Amino acid sequence: LQGFNDEVLDLDHETFARECAIDVPGPETDALGALARQWDAFVMGQAKARHPEFPGRFFNVGFVLSPEGEVILRHHKVVPLLPVEHSVTPHNVWDRWIELYGRNLDAFYPVADTEIGRLGFLMANEGSYPENARGLAMNGAEVVYRGPYPHPHVGNGLFEVQNRARALDNNFYLIACNVGTYYLHTDSDVPIDTFGGGSAVIDYRGQIVGRHDYSAGSSWVAGTIDIEALRKFRASAQWDNWIKDLTTEQYQLIYEQPIYPKNLYLDRAPYTHAEYRREVIDRQIELMHERDVWRRPDKG
């Protein structure tokens, strides 16, 4: 709802949390809830929002509004747009988060069970990591909101590849909703577009059933979502309903060693862009080289 000024302009986290972040529920979701009631529809969206247990901080929160206008799901983004997004994630405050919500799928990949299907969130950069989509699927998701993704990875096709792969791998519908143009400052005269369209509805076999490539402004996309067809496919396919065949004991070996540091912002505000590169990115790349996961490039 607030755009991306905090990311683009490298704004101070605590100032943004105090002056720009919202509460969910709050006046903004109340206004959207009125539209949900008017049109007897579910509304899915996201906003930079505060959390009562983490004063001075904000998260990127996905929310579902019911046709009655009530907030029935809140999802706290688990991977920000690294390295520029300042939103805190559950992993950034891991110890306190699991103390509050437990160490289970609902704490990180919540799903709303509704009359139109089980709804979940795969917001923006979350979709860059297959594990996040799988977490939703393992918690029962059937229709997944994929939030906005910027250039260059819309124009070069990466956004579509990710979206179709996540839907195919997990046999769920994916609604990829990119953003239109926006104004970077309150006094801006000309809107900018750093995203580039690519909104789509993708079915549980990875096929596009509706797509809107580009409009240089606000627009819409539509497609049929057949939940019963999805459920029948999952229940009757012999091969490509993949999740039934997961050899989980084997896959656990991949993740035995920690990689990204947990509790990064448990006791401090998120880094600025320059700090993040120095304190996190450079160290993470070195870690991959030290473990011989990646081979170092030749010098010169």
Give a label for each model feature:
Residues 19-21, 68-71, 88-90, 98-101, ...:
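Glycine-rich loops and low-complexity Gly/Arg-rich segments
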Residues 20-44, 118, 124-222:
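CN hydrolase (nitrilase-like) catalytic-core segments centered on the catalytic cysteine
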Residues 1-20, 146:
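Short, conserved active-site loops that position catalytic residues or coordinate cofactors/metal ions
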Residues 178-300:
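C-terminal beta-strand edge segments of enzyme domains
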Residues 47-48:
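Recurrent small/Gly-Pro-centered beta-turn motifs in extracellular repeat architectures
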Residues 21-22, 30, 34, 51-142, ...:
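Active-site catalytic loop in hydrolytic enzyme cores
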Residues 2-3, 63, 74-81, 200, ...:
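Short beta->alpha transition motifs characteristic of CBS
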Residues 11, 87-89, 186-189:
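Short helix-coil transition/hinge motifs at the ends and kinks of transmembrane helices
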